[in-house]
Amino acid sequence: MPAHILQEISGSYSATTTITAPPSGGQQNGGEKFEKNPHHWGADVRPEIKDDLYDPSYQDEEGPPPKLEYVWRNIVLMALLHIGALYGITLVPSCKVYTCLFAYLYYVISALGITAGAHRLWSHRTYKARLPLRLFLIIANTMAFQNDVYEWARDHRAHHKFSETHADPHNSRRGFFFSHVGWLLVRKHPAVKEKGGKLDMSDLKAEKLVMFQRRYYKPGLLLMCFILPTLVPWYCWGETFVNSLCVSTFLRYAVVLNATWLVNSAAHLYGYRPYDKNISSRENILVSMGAVGEGFHNYHHAFPYDYSASEYRWHINFTTFFIDCMALLGLAYDRKRVSKAAVLARIKRTGEESCKSG
């Protein structure tokens, strides 16, 4: 990439907009008061939401957990998908180059629909996006097929607020397999339904684009996740139908799913905890590579309101780079960032001893 473009994007990053007070009159931009300020804050002052912050007062009730209720439809469908994906791996050498490039591009866009869309924009409100970007992200999210934005955000806010309890949809204390995929193969724990149902989701209910996706999600996901990625290689450059189905669709979809799931499983079990040793989430570079920047998980749980989800800007974090590029184009704004002083103070206060300095 030309140096002058990188400089412009870097300059856009340094001009991160920061909310300095709850919005009330004054200068307006997108209906909210904010100002550009190079001195980033360390405390969460988002006016939109608070239900993604950890609630230490919630504790699991004593007694044996309820009996697991298997969802056999999900078990069968997940098994068939991964069988198709494994077969797709054997077909990659016979695929046309265009098919491999198309599948990779589809994977990246799908991943951004989760990371930049459902996660950092709609679950945590760490930045704001104008309509063209929100439209792109809602389409990309539909391509990813990991539940609609509303349901994804509700589960994720519950994961943060009730982390490592039975009210956490993918509680890592129940083991690697459960937090990775098992939670999707059984009925939700009653605590997930109870506590998740009480979360404040009014910000998403008020967003017409999110509600439109939720209303038409089934036909949308069939088109964007399965039909389109199968037909495009087959029709446009003469790829075989089986290669299109098993590589561009099954393999690509399985990779996106597992990259996201590893954030819930591996990044809660393997890695180091420089910011907070008292929580299970960890920094995992390998997860960040696959999940386009979501592997800095100890930082993210310590500072869920930081749009970068990492202390280190673009380092193994394509999602942050993407958001900064959108900011350069004027499509993303009000990106929230934690000050270096606040990060260092948190490391000193709660970080693992091996990660502290000075």
From Swiss-Prot:
Tissue: Detected in brain and adipose tissue, and at much lower levels in testis. Detected in liver when rats are kept on a fat-free diet, but not when their food contains unsaturated fatty acids.
Positions of substrate binding: 74, 147, 154-155, 187-188, 261
Gene Ontology annotations of biological process type: fatty acid biosynthetic process; monounsaturated fatty acid biosynthetic process; myelination; response to fatty acid; unsaturated fatty acid biosynthetic process
Disulfide bonds: none
Family under the similarity heading: Belongs to the fatty acid desaturase type 1 family.
Cofactor(s) demanded: Fe(2+)
Identification of the protein by name: Stearoyl-CoA desaturase 2
Membrane topology per record: Multi-pass membrane protein
Composition-biased stretches (Basic and acidic residues): 32-43
Gene: Scd2
An example Gene Ontology CC term for this record: endoplasmic reticulum
Originating organism: Rattus norvegicus
Stretches of the chain found on the membrane's Lumenal side: 93-96, 237-240
Motif window: Histidine box-3: 297-301
Residue numbers binding Fe cation 1: 119, 124, 156, 160, 300
Binding positions (Fe cation 2): 159, 268, 297, 301
